[in-house]
Amino acid sequence: PEKPEGYDARAAQTLLESFPDEDIPEGEKIAVMGVMLEAFCDLTDFDALAGFDTVQEVYAPWHALEEQSLSGRLLTNIFAGGTVDTEWGFLTGASEHDEYRGATGSYVRYFTAQGYAAHYAHPGYSWFYDRERVNDYLGFERSVFTENGFGELVDPYVAMWHSDQQLADYLLADLDAADGSPLFSFAVSYQNHGPYAETESTVPYVSPEASGWSQESCNMLNNYLFGVNETVREYVRLTQELDARDTPVVLVLFGDHKPWMGNGGSVYEEMGIDFDTSTLAGFRNYYATP
């Protein structure tokens, strides 16, 4: 990338050094909880879907949550897959990564050095992306996957479409078990993982008659929105449950990438979404998540 206009490396280093590197005071070691949401994006960002009241209703609780929070858009470097690029970027601050082969600097290790417990949760298999091993390298003290916990809570196949309730409940129980001790927890959801069926759908959020799009495209959108509708409500519930507790918590929710929508992004193409990444608008459309 080109050097930004007005950038001065020496001035940047001086500015960086002006921020003190201090430990978190004992009385301020509040819980920090991060949740990366599988294939989560706000489809009302696209004009093609923003005009549907049924779609707006899906995201209305999320929009209300955004109004109460610090919110915006995360620009990832992946589309419809490659989840761990966003995951490990969040945990390390590095925009790119090589294969992890040993102990690696991370925010996880920062928190454990400050006396926090560091827990990881994902209702999927530990071998996928070699997460179990990498989590050890990143500094997590405990990682719970399908094999050692979530398999008793939700069938791993069903988890692709319905597991946010179980994950939210697990995170709350883990927080309660900490009983006020400093805790950094990070979870990767599995619900809404693609692909989304194109042959049928349960709830008709959009239809060929109202949209002019093919039945197959509408089915994929409807099946995705059906899962997202539940996701939104589960994590709004999570925030409400946290608000009801005496223990303060910093909660960070974000999506890992845009959802897969047909081979070659066929659904996006049919909706007329601009994915020209040579333009700022197209780049944001392609990579931005809440």
Task: Specify the residue positions occupied by each region the protein language model found.
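Solvent-exposed soluble domains appended to multi-pass membrane proteins
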Residues: 8-30, 34-290
